[in-house]
Amino acid sequence: MVHFTAEEKAAITSLWGKMNVEEAGGESLGRLLVVYPWTQRFFDNFGNLSSPSAILGNPKVKAHGKKVLTSFGDAIKNMDNLKTTFAKLSELHCDKLHVDPENFRLLGNVMVIILATHFGKEFTPEVQAAWQKLVSAVAIALGHKYH
């Protein structure tokens, strides 16, 4: 289990309160699909994913990205119990969707980059470290069913 300090929790929740989940979520998933094109195979029903502009403008990518980032709201509310919080999503992604758990780590890293671009100077090294810790812990929780 990962322990978050009071300072880390404050850094995460402060930024979360200012985040445009729809915009950052769509951009995060879109960038994942552009930078790691093999991840597109899990989104066959999303329509046109033929180019970066098609991916980033795709309404299904944006909608699912929002859904993914919204689940981080659950992580933020339950930072001390991520394994339980993501148990059902872990089972879904493992048993039904057969998603490579490495993709969770990749998406987390893309999310951190997107946050940095959205928040600029406010995204200090301390804030980055806290968010990196969170996305890593969420990736581990989502991959739990695989072990």
UniProtKB/Swiss-Prot annotation:
What is known about what this protein does?
A: The epsilon chain is a beta-type chain of early mammalian embryonic hemoglobin.
For this UniProt record, the keywords arranged alphabetically read as follows:
Heme, Iron, Metal-binding, Oxygen transport, Phosphoprotein, Transport
Tissue-level expression reads:
Red blood cells.
Q: Where does heme b bind?
A: H64, H93
The name this protein goes by in its record: Hemoglobin subunit epsilon
State the PROSITE patterns in the record.
GLOBIN
- Lineage per the UniProt record: Eukaryota, Metazoa, Chordata, Craniata, Vertebrata
Q: Which residues carry this modification: Phosphoserine?
A: S14, S51
Looking at the record's lineage, which domain of life comes first? Eukaryota
Can you provide one Gene Ontology molecular function annotated for this UniProt record? metal ion binding
Boundaries of every Globin domain copy: 3-147
Name the encoding gene, please: HBE1
Q: Which Pfam families match?
A: Globin
Q: Please verify whether the record's keywords include Phosphoprotein.
A: yes
Per the record, its GO cellular-component terms are:
blood microparticle; haptoglobin-hemoglobin complex; hemoglobin complex
Subunit-level organization:
Heterotetramer of two alpha chains and two epsilon chains in early embryonic hemoglobin Gower-2; two zeta chains and two epsilon chains in early embryonic hemoglobin Gower-1.
Query: Which InterPro entries does this UniProt record tie to the protein?
Result: Globin, Globin-like_sf, Globin/Proto, Hemoglobin_b, Hemoglobin_oxygen_transport
Keyword Transport attributed: yes
Q: What does the sequence similarity comment in the record state about its family?
A: Belongs to the globin family.
